[in-house]
């Protein structure tokens, strides 16, 4: 409510009260101060005070918002609703003032700030359809009524910022969201990132028309606020901060990364709405960490838009069709043309090549070829064959600038950065003139590349010309670091960087580079790239981190069959997601050259589902056939994972035929969230393969009929499946009866995971089967199965009678202390065989630890106990530690993460460490352990009789002094590992 009184005056409202009302106001004020236990004002002063004096007294003794809140309450008690309504209208005046300011600002800045280079082609007037589309942005796809968190997803330069500007302009003109939002604030992440630290109040104030924004007024109705956050990818954040790092105070300065994370993860202003623009890569990185209510895809130019633009440039209809067809044949190039400014680049590049009488086929060979042709054309006059020395120097400096920007996440460059990389003030007009650089929309003295992909290709050219050691900035790393960073998707804004490096190694690109710069290039880079791939080949962990699609695009751009075969045979494991037609083409091109693969994980999302254009269908299926052929060509492949995929009938049959091939000997088949639009019996025929030992169907919908088909196969003698995962498959209690028959008949099934299915009443059927003497199951996982009180008696009976069950996980069920007591009665029996019990998130308290302690003292088989995420507190841990010290306890691992522990329990833990001869691992993350408590723990860990090897603590949860202690103790103790994930 800041500035409200200065703008409108409390005295003015008090003047509206007559003498009798004014005295009544004072009486009510006295009561309010007493009720709220506020600092007292002298009643003598209040009684004597004039209206002006009383207003000043209130403002002197209380914060403005508190004074206003009391005034509002008193007006309500006095039944002066007219004054309340008038105040409401006056406050709304802030909104109208801001709305008018935003309209003026957007109208004034529109052409400069959000200009698209093909504006003559893409100019549109607002229509009712536009307004309807904007309103539809905030129609939630989730059923629960929640504040909006909408992502606008699309490639860089495709028109997201323009769309957001149009939306804000429509709001400022009173056409949309008038009753929904009082304020819409626009934050450009390029500006936010420069601030380093800021509060939300500061960001809002920067957008306000006056020097002081009425922050309290604005934030008083958070549900009436819409924050538009543009270019989120610039922040390079993945929203992975711990909850404790987030902030809920709008006036507190924070690192801007934390501030945005606090907003988007709803720690701050949870009732407000957000509209966020981001690239697909950024959205993918944050998915699951930010709960979005809707995702809108911005696709840019469609086929008819691209064709129309080509026609406007080439005039000749026949020539236009010829050129358009050539571009369309290269799906990667055609995808580039969906971005308006890049469509202009492609078209003008081809036009220049025609004017020079050159062959367009070679230019359109690969995306790299088109980009380099365009860039070199910019620096070679139409009449000349070669560039001038000045042009060579300008491009070389530009490439140096681009490389620095890629490593420092800089896409807007000041004059200092230009000079540091050799670009003089006199060069700038030329670079602007040829349209490789343009003035930043934010500042007259800063510059950006025409599109981020042009910066990427220039940065790639730098590495062909010079070593990173020759660069003026130490931030620029080696070619090896570049390739690993690109393949591991460490930097989400590196879309083409690595693939351009590979593309520039093609013979024709080498010739172009040598012709332009006038000297021969070193062939050392090609050897370095192959060494990178060999390093990946020898490192299983690195192979898991490599994004297969990034690798495929690198090899595709290089267009070297021999190198491709060599590179693909370095890979034993590949994980990739093909999101569109272009991805499928590139993946197929590479996979058909692979013969050493052992593990393959793939997703084609909706690319191979129904509804594809007829012209694409045949090509798509051919590509899918090539992708599946790796199941035959790689003789040692033993794991296939297909996830998040919809396959039409033909695509399903192609996969089926390859999996049924005699030489395909998969041991593990993982099918997660997959829809096969074909006869499901075909799929269940696949799992009859006698080599198959592990079947994971998690997240894949299974009807009751599917469950019957599955269990028929599992019950067959020839079936060798030992591990079955059917979590979140929409199973019902009735399905438990079918699985129960398998538990009795199958001699192979050892592991069954039924998590995240509503099984409550079905547990009785499962339990009867588990008690059967023919049941050989060893591991049963029932996490989040909506188990009720009656289930614990059934499972207790299983624990008493089953002699093969080693592991039971019933986490995330309402077990509570009462249910735990029932299970512990069975686990405390001397003949209990269970070795591992997990009861995380089960609402267990200190009281439940008494029963667990009894189990630890009596059960000599229990080796692993997971009690994390239960509020057992220090008293509960004391009970467990006393039991762990008992000679009958042979526990090896215990999980106590997020159990509301403090440093006070460390003495008990230390005592357990030194007395228990079997304990080797403990997880203590997300507890309030202090420095002094940890010193006690480490003293115990130094003792010779202590056998603990793994300590679960997240070092970054502690202050600097404690972090140093943890690192020093880990270094001193060669047997100890402190891990953040246990």
UniProtKB/Swiss-Prot annotation:
Pfam family, one: PYRIN
Span of domain NACHT: 148-471
LRR repeat boundaries on the chain: 594-617, 689-716, 746-773, 802-825, 827-844, 859-882, 916-940
Binding-site positions, ATP: 154-161
Pyrin domain residues: 1-93
UniProt GO MF annotations: ATP binding
InterPro entries documented for this protein: DAPIN, DEATH-like_dom_sf, Leu-rich_rpt, LRR_dom_sf, NACHT_NTPase, NLRP_HD2, NLRP_innate_immun_reg, NOD1/2_WH
Entry keywords, A to Z: ATP-binding, Inflammatory response, Leucine-rich repeat, Nucleotide-binding, Repeat
Domain of life, per lineage: Eukaryota
Single GO BP term: inflammatory response
Assigned protein family: Belongs to the NLRP family.
Role summary: May be involved in inflammation and recognition of cytosolic pathogen-associated molecular patterns (PAMPs) not intercepted by membrane-bound receptors.
Protein name as it appears in the record: NACHT, LRR and PYD domains-containing protein 4C
Organism: Mus musculus
Organism phylogeny: Eukaryota, Metazoa, Chordata, Craniata, Vertebrata
Name of the gene encoding the protein in the UniProt record: Nlrp4c
């Amino acid at each position: 409510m800041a500035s409200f009184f200065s703008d409108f005056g409390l005295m003015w409202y008090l003047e509206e009260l007559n003498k009798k009302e004014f005295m009544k106001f004072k009486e009510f004020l006295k009561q309010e101060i007493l009720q709220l236990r506020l600092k007292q004002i002298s009643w003598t002063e209040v009684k004597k005070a004039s209206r002006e004096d009383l207003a000043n007294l209130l403002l002197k003794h209380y914060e403005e918002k508190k004074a206003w809140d009391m005034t509002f309450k008193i007006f309500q008690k006095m039944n002066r609703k007219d004054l309340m309504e008038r105040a409401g209208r006056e406050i709304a005046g802030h909104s109208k003032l801001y709305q008018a300011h935003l309209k003026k600002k957007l109208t004034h800045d529109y052409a400069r700030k959000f200009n698209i280079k093909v504006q003559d082609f893409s100019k549109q007037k607002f229509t009712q359809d536009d307004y309807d589309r904007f309103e539809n942005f905030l129609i939630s796809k989730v059923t629960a009524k929640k504040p909006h968190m909408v992502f606008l997803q699309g490639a860089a330069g495709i028109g997201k910022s323009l769309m957001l500007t149009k939306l804000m302009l429509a709001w400022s003109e009173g056409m949309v969201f008038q009753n929904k939002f009082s304020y819409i604030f626009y934050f450009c992440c390029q500006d936010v990132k420069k601030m380093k630290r800021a509060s939300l109040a500061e960001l809002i104030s920067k957008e306000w028309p006056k020097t002081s924004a009425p922050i309290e007024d604005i934030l008083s109705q958070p549900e009436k606020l819409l924050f538009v956050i543009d270019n989120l990818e610039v922040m390079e954040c993945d929203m992975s901060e711990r909850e404790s790092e987030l902030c809920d105070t709008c006036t507190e300065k924070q690192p801007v990364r934390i501030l945005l994370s606090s907003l988007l993860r709803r720690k701050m202003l949870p009732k407000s709405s957000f509209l966020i623009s981001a690239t697909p890569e950024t959205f993918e990185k944050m998915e699951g960490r930010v709960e979005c209510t809707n995702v809108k895809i911005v696709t840019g130019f469609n086929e008819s838009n691209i064709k129309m633009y080509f026609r406007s440039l080439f005039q000749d209809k026949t020539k236009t069709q010829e050129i358009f067809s050539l571009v369309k044949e290269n799906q990667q190039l055609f995808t580039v043309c969906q971005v308006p400014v890049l469509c202009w680049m492609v078209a003008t590049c081809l036009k220049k090549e025609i004017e020079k009488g050159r062959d367009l086929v070679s230019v359109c060979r690969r995306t790299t070829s088109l980009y380099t042709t365009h860039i070199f054309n910019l620096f070679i006059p139409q009449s000349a064959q070669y560039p001038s020395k000045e042009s060579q120097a300008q491009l070389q400096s530009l490439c140096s600038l681009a490389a620095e920007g890629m490593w420092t996440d800089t896409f807007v460059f000041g004059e200092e950065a230009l000079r540091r990389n050799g670009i003089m003030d006199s060069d700038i007009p030329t670079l602007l003139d040829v349209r490789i650089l343009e003035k930043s929309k934010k500042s007259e003295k800063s510059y950006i590349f025409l599109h981020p992909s042009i910066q990427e290709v220039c940065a790639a050219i730098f590495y062909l010309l010079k070593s990173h050691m020759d660069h003026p900035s130490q931030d620029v790393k080696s070619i090896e670091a570049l390739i690993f960073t690109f393949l591991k998707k460490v930097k989400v804004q590196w879309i083409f960087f690595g693939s351009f490096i590979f593309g520039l190694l093609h013979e024709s690109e080498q010739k172009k580079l040598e012709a332009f710069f006038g000297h021969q290039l070193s062939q050392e880079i090609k050897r370095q790239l192959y060494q990178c791939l060999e390093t990946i080949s020898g490192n299983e962990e690195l192979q898991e981190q490599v994004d297969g699609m990034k690798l495929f695009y690198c090899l595709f751009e290089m267009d070297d069959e021999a190198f491709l075969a060599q590179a693909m045979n370095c890979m034993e494991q590949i994980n990739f997601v093909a999101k569109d037609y272009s991805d499928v083409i590139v993946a197929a091109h590479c996979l058909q050259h692979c013969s050493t693969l052992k593990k393959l994980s793939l997703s084609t999302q909706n690319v191979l589902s129904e509804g594809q254009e007829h012209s694409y269908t045949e090509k798509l299926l051919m590509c899918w056939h090539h992708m599946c052929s790796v199941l035959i060509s790689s003789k040692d492949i033993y794991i296939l994972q297909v996830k998040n995929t919809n396959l039409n009938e033909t695509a399903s049959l192609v996969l089926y035929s390859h999996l049924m091939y005699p030489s395909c000997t998969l041991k593990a088949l993982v099918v997660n969230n997959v829809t096969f639009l074909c006869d499901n019996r075909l799929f269940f025929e696949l799992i009859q393969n006698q080599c198959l030992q592990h079947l994971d169907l998690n997240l894949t919908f299974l009807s009751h009929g599917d469950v019957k088909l599955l269990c028929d196969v599992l019950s067959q003698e020839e079936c060798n499946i030992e591990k079955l995962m059917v979590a979140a498959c929409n199973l019902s209690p009735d399905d438990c009866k079918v699985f129960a028959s398998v538990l009795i008949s199958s001699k192979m099934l050892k592991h069954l995971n039924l998590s995240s299915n509503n099984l409550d009443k079905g547990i009785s059927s499962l339990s009867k089967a588990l008690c059967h003497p023919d049941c050989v199951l060893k591991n049963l996982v029932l996490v989040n199965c909506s188990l009720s009180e009656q289930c614990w008696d059934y499972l207790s009976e299983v624990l008493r009678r089953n002699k093969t069950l080693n592991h039971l996980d019933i986490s995330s069920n309402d077990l509570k202390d009462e249910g735990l007591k029932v299970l512990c009665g069975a686990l405390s029996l001397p003949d209990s065989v269970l070795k591992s019990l997990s009861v995380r998130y089960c609402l267990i308290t200190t009281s439940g630890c008494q029963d667990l302690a009894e189990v630890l003292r009596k059960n000599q088989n229990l080796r692993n106990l997971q009690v994390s995420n239960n509020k057992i507190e220090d008293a509960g841990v004391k009970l467990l530690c006393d039991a762990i010290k008992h000679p009958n306890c042979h526990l090896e691992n215990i999980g106590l993460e997020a159990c509301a522990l403090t440093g006070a329990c460390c003495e008990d833990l230390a005592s357990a460490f030194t007395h228990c001869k079997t304990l080797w691992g403990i997880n203590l993350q997300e507890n309030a352990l202090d420095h002094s408590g940890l010193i006690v723990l480490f003293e115990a860990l130094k003792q010779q009789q202590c056998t603990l090897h793994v300590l679960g603590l997240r070092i970054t949860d502690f202050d600097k002094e404690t972090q140093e202690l943890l690192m020093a103790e880990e270094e001193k103790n060669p047997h100890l590992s402190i891990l953040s994930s246990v």
